[in-house]
Amino acid sequence: MDIKAYFELIRLKNCLTASFGAFIGGLIASYFNISMIDNLILASIVVFLVCGFGNALNDIYDLKIDKINKPKRPIPSKRISLGEARIFSYLLVVMGLIISMFNITCFLMAVLNSIVLQQYASTYKKNKIVGNLIVAYLTGSVFIFGGIAVGNIDVTIMLFLCALFAMWSREIIKDYEDIEGDIKEKVISIPIKCGEKSIYIAAFLLVFAVLLSPLPYLFGFFGIYYLISVIFCDLLFLIGIYNLVMNPSKKEAKKASRNIKIVTNLVLIAFLIGSLFK
């Protein structure tokens, strides 16, 4: 068995990042209550396994395209057979769902996200108008999952919403970068439908995320340290998207996409600061 090939199949780095997101979400929601560590570890394992299932499914459904565009991926390179990939993906999701039974709400959300991942891989990868929203939802949902695991989703819902709208904006900007390739692949996307106007849609979504970001302070969940930290992040968001609106080039779109990814991680740190120094 080529272990490295299986790690490539599930995109190990992505799985670890998602798993870490659930762990951090739970830490924030529990205000660093160490007695919840068992639940946090279980939640992180579930997210790792379900994320791996989704990534493996993507490669299964993309086999024809990957034979041309990514021939070194595990399945087209025949390091893993199509049948082995299917069995492995089923094992991942079954193990993830079994472990998620430590909390009935976690189990229900794991089932929901597994279905969403399957639908995304099979149906919505070429319809990015829907697919972008799915990716944004899945990105943000790991924080709620961590909150569910520790029995408190109040703060993580706000983190989820900020992440959802920021990532939704980023996905549209990425599609703007890739518009020529998507036209060739007959993909449906907002930039293909709207052209440069799609930048304004992305800007609106990002500004909405910025407007949501002070809510944990306004509702009294976090204190002034959070507010100062998140305002700094918001300024970085706004500068990046302003530059793109003023100069809607592919080069500027790439910068804006990278900026959103980096600043979203900084927002996560702001939430950690808020949880630590309430």
Swiss-Prot record:
Its localization reads:
Cell membrane
A single MF term (Gene Ontology): magnesium ion binding
- Look up and give the membrane topology term: Multi-pass membrane protein
List GO terms (cellular component aspect). plasma membrane
The source's domain of life comes to Archaea
What keywords does the record list, in alphabetical order?
Answer: Cell membrane, Lipid biosynthesis, Lipid metabolism, Magnesium, Membrane, Phospholipid biosynthesis, Phospholipid metabolism, Transferase, Transmembrane, Transmembrane helix
Q: Which cofactor does it need?
A: Mg(2+)
Recorded catalytic reaction(s): these are: sn-3-O-(geranylgeranyl)glycerol 1-phosphate + (2E,6E,10E)-geranylgeranyl diphosphate = 2,3-bis-O-(geranylgeranyl)-sn-glycerol 1-phosphate + diphosphate
Ligase listed as a keyword: no
EC number(s) recorded for this UniProt protein:
2.5.1.42
Q: Which GO terms describe its biological process?
A: glycerophospholipid biosynthetic process
Q: Does the keyword Magnesium apply?
A: yes
For this chain, the family text in UniProt reads: Belongs to the UbiA prenyltransferase family. DGGGP synthase subfamily.
Protein task: Prenyltransferase that catalyzes the transfer of the geranylgeranyl moiety of geranylgeranyl diphosphate (GGPP) to the C2 hydroxyl of (S)-3-O-geranylgeranylglyceryl phosphate (GGGP). This reaction is the second ether-bond-formation step in the biosynthesis of archaeal membrane lipids.
Which HAMAP family does the UniProt entry name for this protein?
Answer: DGGGP_synth
| Name of the protein | Digeranylgeranylglyceryl phosphate synthase
